[in-house]
Amino acid sequence: MEMMILISLCLTTFLTILLFFKSLLKRPNSNLPPSPWRLPVIGNLHQLSLHPHRALSSLSARHGPLMLLRFGRVPVLIVSSADVAHDVMKTHDLKFANRPITKSAHKISNGGRDLVFAPYGEYWRNVKSLCTIHLLSNKMVQSSEKRREEEITLLMETLEEASLSSSSVNLSKLITNMVSDIMGKVVLGKKYSGEEGTIDVKTITKSFLDAVGLSPVGEYIPSLAWIGKITGSDGKLEKITKQFGDFIEKVLQEHEDTTADKETPDFVDMLLTIQRDETAQCQLDKSDLKVIIFEMFLGSTTTTSAVIEWAMTRLMRNPECLKKLQDEIRSVSKMNSYVSGKEVENMNYLKAVIKEVLRLHPPLPLLVPRLLSEDVKLKGYDITAGTQVIINAWAIQRDTATWGSDAQEFRPERHFDSTWDFVGRNFKYIPFGAGRRLCPGIGLGSVMASVTLANLVKRFDWRVEDGPSGYDKPDLVEGAGIDVCRKFPLVVFPSSA
């Protein structure tokens, strides 16, 4: 077995080197963006490191805000400035509206039948419309206030118990579980935590993001696809798909058995109703339902949890900001112990804190890649159809040319005089993307994050447990991968205010 692997490696390397030198003989006349030096066969894949957004930001600092890399033989355009992002997501948005679908993304999205990876077109518009109408609209967000209050109240009770016993809590885990339970009620009709056959949201989300990340060699070099079997990444992807598929199958079966008895249909009920309607504009089969539910449930859970976790991290690192926020919340919300969604609308410093957290810690620092559908001229360079485009929101939102010399610092006050919001109108601030592919779940996520943070800050004072030794700022260390969750959980001591 080992000999066969060695022979395969040698043959593959020999053939790819031949192809590499053959490509050197070609002298294209195209005017291409600057590129760093790359290796044969793998191109620039080796330069991504454990934190691709940071690695690409460093490369862009040397080669410019519009940079062309090769992932294997696949051309990938890296955008690291607001000016170029404007051209991609507004001026030429339609040409850049498609998605590249890697092997892992194809499997997880049922061949692009979800919302994130679906090709731009009628099906994508229909899915986006039904998700917005039945889950993500302002009307639906407001109607889920009671469900949010129930779960946030349970979290407050858990923290109160810890306060009385002077115990520490893993706030990262508590927040993830709470958001998962809220989304369970909103998307699935009930929370499934504690039931047999449920999933570990944080673990499966991390595995999902790793599976559709940038690093798998086989995704970009088909001749080396067999490496996934040896490293186990193919098996991990199969396990993720089956695990979540089985869970959603259980959810669908429960809904098929009980839909007729419900007074208020949930999101899954609405999808099943649409599926049964042969005259519906959007025809969906069960596999389509599974990937749409997967996306709405996990997507909202992971992004919202990360925002709250980073917000608490930053506030405890900056006690003067925490004090300002506590004063505002306790001044606006005096009558009730619970801070409602209506009350947070009048909290300007809270809004600034959320904006600053999303500036420093966008949920996906590298926006979901786009695919160019036809040739285009971009900043004087010739970009050919089939080129993938990655926009480094993390780099754009820490650009000192835009944000000043303190761009790396947490300073909510910088947002007081700005009219910037989350919906991509200003390309210097794009935590959820912009243009046609703007994330449609902004309203739901921002309300959950704001209300949860307001209640955490109002009800308790906080002391953070010392992090592991060996790190300069352990609480700010990012985990590996394409998301930016904390490497270490946020362990804190709450005390009733």
Curated annotation (Swiss-Prot):
GO terms for biological process: triterpenoid metabolic process. SUPFAM superfamilies: Cytochrome P450. It is a single-pass membrane protein. It is found in: Membrane. The keyword Nucleotide-binding does not apply. Keywords: Heme, Iron, Membrane, Metal-binding, Monooxygenase, Oxidoreductase, Transmembrane, Transmembrane helix. The chain crosses the membrane at residues 1-21. Its cofactor is heme. One of its GO terms (molecular function) is monooxygenase activity. One of its GO terms (cellular component) is membrane. It is an enzyme of class 1 (oxidoreductase). Its main location: membrane. It comes from the Eukaryota. Pfam families: p450 (PF00067). This is Cytochrome P450 71A16. It comes from Arabidopsis thaliana (Mouse-ear cress). The lineage of its organism: Eukaryota, Viridiplantae, Streptophyta, Embryophyta, Tracheophyta.
